[in-house]
Swiss-Prot record:
Entry's transmembrane regions: 33-53, 61-81, 101-121, 126-146, 160-180
Predominant place of localization: membrane
Job description of the protein: Probably functions as a manganese efflux pump.
GO CC list: plasma membrane
Source organism, top-level taxon: Bacteria
UniProt-recorded name of the protein: Putative manganese efflux pump MntP
Organism: Campylobacter concisus (strain 13826)
Family designation: Belongs to the MntP (TC 9.B.29) family.
Keyword Iron-sulfur: no
Record bears the keyword Iron-sulfur: no
InterPro entries per record: Mntp/YtaF (IPR003810), Put_MntP (IPR022929)
Keywords: Cell inner membrane, Cell membrane, Ion transport, Manganese, Membrane, Transmembrane, Transmembrane helix, Transport
Length: 185
C-alpha cells in the first residue's frame, strides 16, 4: 500500500505535465500520446534505480540518520509540490519533439531519484519498486492526457497538491515509524 501511495505521489508531476499537454494538444495522435506516457513512466522507473544505488554506496556512513534523511527529502519534495500547486503560474507544457519529451520526462522524475536514495535505507526490492512506480506513472500519465484534453488545465494544480500531501504523509510515517522502533516516542 505504501509503495502504491509513493508511486501515485511521484507520478503527479508527470501526470500534471501530461494533463497540460492534453489541454494544449487536443488533436495529438494516440501513438505520440502513448510514447510520451511511456517516456514519463520509463524515467520514473529509471531514476529510483539510480538513486537507490547512489544511496547504497554511502548508506553505511549514514545508517543512523537515514530516517531523518528520508523525512526531510520527502517533506521537501512534498512542500515543493504544494508550492507549485498554489502558484499562480501554470507550468510549461512539453513541445512535442523528441528532445523536449526527454527533458520533460527527466525533469518530472528528479523527485524519483531522491526517493530512490531514501529507498536504499529500506528493506525493499528496488527493481520491483521501480517497476511499480514506472507502471503507475505510465498509466496515470496516459489517463491524465485524456483528462486534460477534456477538463483543461484547472485540474493540473489539484494533482500536484495531492501528490505533495502524500509525500509529506510518507515522510512523517517513515520518521514516526523509526522513532517508535528506537523507543524515542
Amino acid at each position: 500500500m505504501q509503495l502504491l501511495l509513493l508511486s501515485f505521489a511521484l507520478s503527479m508531476d508527470s501526470a500534471a505535465l501530461n494533463m497540460a499537454n492534453g489541454a494544449r494538444y487536443k488533436s495529438l495522435g494516440f501513438g505520440k500520446i502513448l510514447f510520451i506516457a511511456f517516456m514519463l513512466g520509463f524515467f520514473q522507473f529509471l531514476m529510483p534505480l539510480l538513486g537507490y544505488f547512489l544511496g547504497i554506496s554511502f548508506a553505511k556512513f549514514i545508517s543512523s540518520i537515514d530516517h531523518f534523511i528520508a523525512f526531510f527529502i520527502l517533506c521537501f519534495l512534498g512542500f515543493k509540490m504544494l508550492k507549485e500547486a498554489c502558484s499562480s503560474e501554470v507550468g510549461e507544457s512539453l513541445s512535442m519533439d523528441i528532445k523536449t519529451i526527454f527533458v520533460g520526462a527527466f525533469a518530472t522524475s528528479i523527485d524519483a531519484l531522491a526517493v530512490g536514495v531514501t529507498l536504499s535505507f529500506e528493506a525493499v526490492s528496488i527493481f520491483e519498486s521501480a517497476l511499480i512506480i514506472g507502471i503507475v506513472c505510465f498509466a496515470l500519465s496516459l489517463a491524465a492526457f485524456y483528462i486534460g484534453k477534456f477538463m483543461g488545465e484547472i485540474l493540473e494544480k489539484k494533482a500536484l497538491f495531492l501528490g505533495g500531501a502524500i509525500l509529506i504523509f510518507l515522510g512523517f510515517k517513515i520518521l514516526i515509524t523509526h522513532l517508535l522502533e528506537e523507543g524515542v516516542l
